[in-house]
Amino acid sequence: MSGNTIGKLFTITTAGESHGEALIGIVDGCPPGLALTEVDLQDDLDLRKPGTSRHTSQRHEEDLVKILSGTFEGKTTGTPIALIIQNTDQRSKDYGNIKDTFRPGHADYTYHQKYGIRDYRGGGRSSARETAMRVACGGIAKKYLKQEYNIKIKGYLSQLGPIKIENSDWLEVHNNPFFCLDANKVKILEKYMDTLRKSGDSVGARINIIVNNMPVGLGEPIFDRLDADIAHSMMSINAVKGVEIGDGFRVVNQKGTEHRDAITLTGFKSNHAGGIFGGISSGQDILVSIALKPTSSLSLPIESIDKRGGPIEVITKGRHDPCVGIRATPIAEAMLAITIMDHVMRHRAQNLNIESITPIIPASI
C-alpha cells in the first residue's frame, strides 16, 4: 500500500488502523534545534480526540502522543522524529456484522476490490482515526512556523448543515465543542445535533482555515503550486469533498473588475485570490475552506451487497460522529501546517539568497 507519505523536503508518513494496536508517525526534514516535547503536540490532539461531548463519537481515546526518536535533551536533532499514539478503546465486536458486507458510502467496497482483503474493524486504515497522528505531526510544523516566521494557522466551523456561522469572535473558538466563533449560535447547534442524533441521521459541515503572517514566495510552479498542494492535503482528509481557495466557487459569478486584487504600496485592497497568485503566496492571508460530507455510518437501514454479490440490508453499529466536521478543525489546521512547512523548506533550499528591488507589499490596507 503506497500513498502514506506527504511532502517533499518536510515529510510525514503515518501507519496504523482504527482498531490496531497503535498509530505511528514519522516526521522527516524538521530542522535541528527546535525545542520539542510531547506537551507541544498534546493540546491539538486533545481538541481532536473523540468522546469529549455528546455531539461526537463516544469512543474514549486519550490520544497521548509519545516521541520515540529525533530529539535529544528536549530539542530536535534533524533526524527522523518517530511518534506513537496507542489505541485503547477499540470495540471490534461492534463490526462483526459487516465482516462480509459492504457499507454504502464507505471505503469497504473499494478497499476490498483494490487489495482483495480489508480490515473491517472500524474501517481499518480508511478510518478517520488515522488523523490523530496527522494532528500530532502537524503540531511540529505549527510550532516551527510560528517560532521562526510567526506564521499562525487557525480554523473554525463556518457551517453545520443549514446553520451558517457568520459572526467572528476568536475568543470563542475553543469555548465550545463545535469550534464556533459565535457564542449565540452554540445552543442552536446543540439543539440541531440533539434532534439529528435522535433521528439516526448525520449531516455535513464546512470548515474555514486562515493562515496569518505568510511570507511572499512560497509555492513551486507549475505542478507543485502552493494552492495545488493545499488542495491535495485537504482532499486527503477523510470525508472532504470540496476545497476552496479564496473566493472559491463564488468566482463564477464575479467579473474581472470585481475579482482582481488591487496592489498599492500600503497594501492589497482585497484578497479574493486567497493569498496566492500563480501558485505562489503573495504575503496576504491564505484563505482555505473545506466541505465535509455527512458520515455514512448510520443506524438506519440501506441496501447493499455482500462479498458474493448477494443483496442485503446494512445497519451500521458502533460509535460514530453524527457530524465529522465537528472534530475536523484541528485536522485541517495540521494538514495546512504540514503543507506550508514543506514549502518553507523548499523555498529556503532554492531561493534563500534571492533579493528584489521591489518592496514587500503589506498583506492588506
Swiss-Prot record:
InterPro entries linked: Chorismate_synth, Chorismate_synth_AroC_sf, Chorismate_synthase_CS
Annotated NADP(+) binding sites: R48, R54
An example GO CC term for this entry is: cytosol
Q: Which GO terms describe its molecular function?
A: chorismate synthase activity; FMN binding
Is the keyword Ligase in the record? no
Cite a single GO BP annotation: chorismate biosynthetic process
Q: Which gene encodes it?
A: aroC
**Keywords, ordered alphabetically:** Amino-acid biosynthesis, Aromatic amino acid biosynthesis, FAD, Flavoprotein, FMN, Lyase, NADP
The keyword Chloroplast is annotated on this UniProt entry: no
User: Might you give the EC number(s) for this enzyme?
Assistant: 4.2.3.5
How the protein assembles, per its UniProt entry? Homotetramer.
Lineage per the UniProt record: Bacteria, Pseudomonadati, Pseudomonadota, Gammaproteobacteria, Candidatus Pseudothioglobaceae
How is this protein named in the record?
Chorismate synthase
Q: Which family does it belong to?
A: Belongs to the chorismate synthase family.
- Textual note on the cofactor: Reduced FMN (FMNH(2)).
Q: Which Pfam families match?
A: Chorismate_synt
Gene3D superfamilies to which the protein is assigned, alphabetical: Chorismate synthase AroC
